[in-house]
Amino acid sequence: MRFNNKTINLQRYPNTANRSLRAWSAADELILETALGLGLEKKKIALMHDTFGAMAVALSTHNPHSIITNASQLKATKLNLANNGLDKKDWEHSNPLNIQSTDIDIALLKIPKSADLFQLYIQQLHATCKSESVILCGFMTRNFTARWKEIAELYFDDVSQSM
């Protein structure tokens, strides 16, 4: 994957023989590019549902806090940090029921297929973000459901959709 004029070496975990499957998606790329446009310097950044750690690796210079939901996500992110020469000790993470980062400025969320899991993420982010925080969400178009927007509107005043 290329981000901010750098090539990032990413692989799926567990590994797969299917070469058409990548460790990142167009949603990751769109979320990252949009976030870059907001300015990331001196911002507290949270990452949610970063399945293989693509966003964690891409934003490693900004010390993002990853919210991890399962062991394979944890292993994949550690693997990809190591594959890119990044120290795993500097990487902070917690689970969505006990987010260890507060006053988040920008949250990047790849929306899961489950509306219930999305609602948990949004609910927890709402509790840890500031009133002026920005939450950028991305998803695979084929998985879209209007329910996601309805859920976001339960917690936030300004909910908009693009692309």
Segments predicted by a language model, with ranges:
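A short acidic, Gly/Pro-enriched loop at the edge of an enzyme's catalytic core
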Residues: 93-106
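A short SAM/SAH-binding and catalytic strip from SAM-dependent methyltransferases
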Residues: 105-119
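Conserved SAM-binding loop of SAM-dependent methyltransferases across substrates and taxa
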Residues: 51-63
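Conserved SAM-binding motif I beta-strand of class I
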Residues: 63-70, 137
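S-adenosyl-L-methionine
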Residues: 1-43, 54-55
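Conserved SAM-binding loop
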Residues: 77-80
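Non-catalytic substrate-recognition/targeting regions of SAM-dependent transferases
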Residues: 1-16, 139-163
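A short glycine-rich, Lys/Arg-flanked "PGG" loop and its adjoining helix->strand segment in the class I
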Residues: 118-134
